[in-house]
Amino acid sequence: MREVISIHIGQGGIQVGNACWDLFCLEHGIQPDGQMPSDKTIGGGDDAFNTFFSETGAGKHVPRAVFLDLEPTVCDEVRTGTYRQLFHPEQLISGKEDAANNFARGHYTIGKEIVDLCLDRIRKLADNCTGLQGFIGFHSVGGGTGSGLGSLLLERLSVDYGKKSKLTFTIYPSPQVSTAVVEPYNSVLSTHSLLEHTDVAVMLDNEAVYDICRRNLDIERPTYTNLNRLIAQVISSLTASLRFDGALNVDVTEFQTNLVPYPRIHFMLSSYAPVISAEKAYHEQLSVAEITNSSFEPASMMAKCDPRHGKYMACCMMYRGDVVPKDVNAAVATIKTKRTIQFVDWSPTGFKCGINYQPPTVVPGGDLAKVMRAVCMISNSTAIAEVFSRIDHKFDLMYAKRAFVHWYVGEGMEEGEFSEAREDLAALEKDYEEVGIETAEGEGEEEGME
């Protein structure tokens, strides 16, 4: 079996996690108490969904996941929510003190008290796997826990499980919408360790997802629940091939192989189509070509950046539902002829496609329409550098005056770590710039890129 362990860190990570497990349970027909009437092999079996769920002897399906937070309220919502019987109480780990939007608290003072307990629980889950293939992390980097404890945990996982791949879904601060003044600090410090300790990071940002909800689903004032349900659909599409049997299945490590040209260039853009409300879906026939085109629309991107300003290096299309390879090939061929969608000249093929025959599932009472087919795209584009340069600019404005820095230093950080992280990100922006430059014929690859 190729199991995957999910790790949800901080409030953002846990709430996205809730939406995901809610959806996974619906997709597999698992009830809130963990029973699965359709599962014929009680207490074990080698079904595809066992990558995400382990089974007890009594036929209960338990997610291979841990939820970590430095304060109890969000974990308590899981403990008392609809799916309270689904999770093992040991999988919900909460501290008593908040990280207070402070990376240093999450990473040094308070995080380090809880991190060994977390690793211990993760070790228990890992021992329960026959062939662990990697970890999927869920966190936001604007706050203190997701950024601080998130990076601490990723660093420790690199040490304990060196070769296992780590994929993260990282919620980045948005250009306009802000939840904390010190977001730029936390994000820069956190990205510094994401650079080293994750293999693929999928960038999401609330503002981009808000706009999609507002525009495509006609929700006037989207709530976090609306956002998380949409994000859950994306994550579900990416992991569908791990959880169901399909024609062209894609493994977690395959994402890495196909999307990451250089180790540092591993921040991905994602998009999902069709995002459409039930009223509209009734009137529209969404063909494979149409959903493929709309997944390349700048407006469909789940992070605020314009892919037309950059070049694609690689692109992974995960189709699900009523889709045949012939249609996919035709749709991709059309995309390649479009002038607006540019690939770097050293990546001529650039597409990896997966098809999964399980149609998308919708949450009852949710916003999305039930459709026959959907596509999720993850792409590596040089345009994502916009996200970094935006954060770096905000970081510089604050750091020039050393504003708020004493809160971090007071928790045992050194000021040097700020400039180190900032320089690392400056180098990353430079890397993205170089990757997009046309290579001159005959001189081959640039040296100096690692």
Swiss-Prot record:
PTM-bearing positions, type N6-acetyllysine: K40
Catalytic reaction(s) noted: GTP + H2O = GDP + phosphate + H(+)
Subcellular localization, as worded in the UniProt entry: Cytoplasm, Cytoskeleton
Binding residue positions for Mg(2+): E71
Keyword S-adenosyl-L-methionine: no
EC nos: 3.6.5.-
InterPro entries: Alpha_tubulin (IPR002452), Tub_FtsZ_C (IPR008280), Tubulin (IPR000217), Tubulin/FtsZ-like_C (IPR037103), Tubulin/FtsZ_2-layer-sand-dom (IPR018316), Tubulin/FtsZ_GTPase_sf (IPR036525), Tubulin_C (IPR023123), Tubulin_CS (IPR017975)
Keywords: Acetylation, Cytoplasm, Cytoskeleton, GTP-binding, Hydrolase, Magnesium, Metal-binding, Microtubule, Nucleotide-binding
Cofactor requirements of the protein: Mg(2+)
Molecular-function GO terms, alphabetical: GTP binding; hydrolase activity; metal ion binding; structural constituent of cytoskeleton
Similarity comment: family membership: Belongs to the tubulin family.
Record function comment: Tubulin is the major constituent of microtubules, a cylinder consisting of laterally associated linear protofilaments composed of alpha- and beta-tubulin heterodimers. Microtubules grow by the addition of GTP-tubulin dimers to the microtubule end, where a stabilizing cap forms. Below the cap, tubulin dimers are in GDP-bound state, owing to GTPase activity of alpha-tubulin.
Subunit architecture: Dimer of alpha and beta chains. A typical microtubule is a hollow water-filled tube with an outer diameter of 25 nm and an inner diameter of 15 nM. Alpha-beta heterodimers associate head-to-tail to form protofilaments running lengthwise along the microtubule wall with the beta-tubulin subunit facing the microtubule plus end conferring a structural polarity. Microtubules usually have 13 protofilaments but different protofilament numbers can be found in some organisms and specialized cells.
Name of the protein in question: Tubulin alpha chain
Species assigned in the record: Euplotoides octocarinatus
